[in-house]
Structures are given as structure tokens and as C-alpha cells.
Amino acid sequence: MMKQARSLLSRSLCDQSKSLFEASTLRGFASWSNSSTPGRGFPGKDAAKPSGRLFAPYSIFKGKAALSVEPVLPSFTEIDSGNLRIDRRGSLMMTFMPAIGERKYDWEKKQKFALSPTEVGSLISMGSKDSSEFFHDPSMKSSNAGQVRKSLSVKPHADGSGYFISLSVNNSILKTNDYFVVPVTKAEFAVMKTAFSFALPHIMGWNRLTGHVNTEALPSRNVSHLKTEPQLELEWDK
């Protein structure tokens, strides 16, 4: 059974000057920690103030390439009387890196693919014999359409033991063709699906509907309860 979902996104190209060589495995879904006992994740009444953010990407390292997945949370803008609306929608950012040696990967040649909530739903609903494929074009509705194309595919192993996750990036501007393939086991894919299900309402901003946000403590124009680094926010940042 083949299940194919096509998504053509129109986003502007922008340059990235900062390498994610050291920090890319640490940046992602951020939350505050206020544990009163070192080494334990349970807050207490005497807990110290948060000392920083916790980052928890899920990474899979294989022989020819590595894959890292991390949620990018939406940003919000205050409109009136403390009300908020989404300014930039969230996504699940998939980062692929080619191998350059045993357990060594070239972070400078990474490529990213931002999954929308609907695309996340397609992966969550996949069965053991299902496939999914997504297409992104940053200039779909302009005269530059087709100059940079990304194709992400998820296909099952013939023996049902897992999936092949591959990303193809064709850049006619730079005249480059990048291709990454990361085989994942059933267990690894199960972790991804479970994590995706947990992250989905957060990248949609729906977690705010059931939580209480003190907007007085947030910036007046562009607010985000949990922020990610700018380098993770755009799929087309290189």
C-alpha cells in the first residue's frame, strides 16, 4: 500500500553564516528545568531558579549518513489586551548529515527538511508496509520555481524490519545534488512516531490553549514561551 503526501512550500532563501558543528546535536525542543535535587527531574518547593534550557533532539547515526530530528516551536505576536496569535508556525526539523569517516559526519554539508503538522500526521499514521513522500519548493509561486527542490521519502524495508528515510536536494543555482539515506529500525521509527505524537500539539501551539501563560513577563511584540535558536527556524537557511 502506497500512501503519498505532497507538500509544496513557498519560502524565501536566506544565507546562514554560522555553523552548527558543535551545537546542532543540542539544539531543539527547549524546556526549563527546576529540580531541587541534582540528577533528579522532580521539582520541589525549595527548587532553585532555572539555570538554562534543556535540549533533546533525537539522533540516528548510521554508516553513510546521520539524521537528527527536533521540534521547532511556533512564535507568537501579541495583538491586543494580552491576546496572542501565531506569527510563525512550528515544524519538526529533520537534519541530514553525510558521513566522512567512521562515526564522523560533515555538519557543514547538512541539509534540512521541515515537516508541517500534516506531514507529521502522515508519518504517525504509517503502517509497516506504507510509504510516504513529500516535496518542498521554496519558490513554488514565483519565476524561480524549481530552482531548489527537496524530496523526502520514507519507504519500508522489504523484510519489514524498518524503513529507509531518504532526502534528495537538487539546487540548480549552486548546481549541486545532495542525497542522503538513513536506514532506521522498527524500534527507532517507533520512537520517532511516539515523539512526533507528543510534539505535534506543541508545534501547532495548541499546548497554550490548555496552559496558563503570563504575557506580562513576555516581550510586547514577538513572544514565544519556548524559543529555539534562529538557525533551526528555517528550512531554507543555507
From Swiss-Prot:
InterPro entries: ssDNA-bd_transcriptional_reg, Whirly. GO terms for cellular component: DNA repair complex; mitochondrion. Its main location: mitochondrion. The keyword rRNA processing does not apply. Residues 1-29 form a transit peptide. GO terms for molecular function: DNA binding; mRNA binding; single-stranded DNA binding. Residues 62-67 are annotated as: Required for ssDNA binding. PANTHER family: SINGLE-STRANDED DNA-BINDING PROTEIN WHY2, MITOCHONDRIAL. Homotetramer. Plants over-expressing WHY2 are small with dark-green distorted leaves, exhibit early senescence and produces shorter siliques with half the amount of seeds found in wild-type plants. This is Single-stranded DNA-binding protein WHY2, mitochondrial. It comes from Arabidopsis thaliana.
